[in-house]
A protein has these predicted regions:
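Loop/turn-to-beta-strand initiation segments
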Residues: 73-76, 98-99
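Conserved lysine of the Walker
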Residues: 17
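Hydrophobic anchor at the beta1->P-loop junction of P-loop NTPases
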Residues: 9
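Small-molecule kinase domains that catalyze NTP-dependent phosphoryl transfer to phosphate-bearing small molecules
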Residues: 116-160
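Conserved substrate/cofactor phosphate-moiety recognition/catalytic segment
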Residues: 22-67
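Conserved phosphate-donor/acceptor-positioning beta-strand/loop module used by diverse small-molecule
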Residues: 94-114
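P-loop (Walker A) phosphate-binding loop of NTP-binding proteins
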Residues: 12
Length: 170
């Protein structure tokens, strides 16, 4: 595997982007960041109040995500929703060697996870909005999809990802 992989762990709220991203980064021996920390205060306030972000809200944030990936030395795994293809294209414009990991799960599983999560600014009420916005990763995009329903543990997801990503990041 490439010793400096650039990986975006993507999906809707509750998919486990941060948890899986941290575990994957540890397995690969690279740094982990959460793109939520790059949101401007106005985006955080908007989401915390139950309002969905617009594309205009997201584009400056995605530019920061892409810049962080482009500047990374030694590899980086970053958790970022990257719900639409145009968002992923914005990231790829800044960091073309980025690979995406799409954490896909049933609405029932995702809702359960969101409702049991504490201390996050994203309310469960926005899950439907995110699912409506989601454009799943396509075969023409650089990355892989993992079903959370088929892989119920973090270890199972990470093991599967390492196996799937190895040929892509070498």
């Amino acid at each position: 595997m490439n010793s400096s992989p650039l990986i975006v762990v993507m999906g809707v709220s509750g998919s486990g982007k941060s948890t899986i991203g941290e575990a994957l980064a540890a397995r690969l021996g690279v740094r982990f960041d959460d793109a939520d920390a790059l949101h401007p205060a106005s985006n955080v306030a908007k989401m915390a109040s139950g309002m969905a972000l617009t594309d205009d809200d997201r584009m400056p944030w995605l530019a920061l995500v892409g810049a962080e990936l482009a500047a990374a030395t030694g590899g980086l795994v970053i958790a970022c929703s990257a719900l639409k293809r145009v968002y992923r294209e914005a990231i790829l414009a800044a960091a073309p060697s980025t690979r995406f990991v799409f954490l896909d799960g049933s609405r029932t599983l995702l809702e359960s996870r969101v409702r049991h999560r504490e201390g996050h600014f994203m309310p469960a009420s926005l899950l439907d909005s995110q699912l409506a916005t989601l454009e799943p990763l396509t075969p023409h995009e650089p990355g892989v999809r993992v079903s959370l329903d088929d892989h119920p543990t973090v270890e199972s997801v990470v093991r599967t990802l390492v196996a799937l990503l190895t040929p892509q990041v070498e």
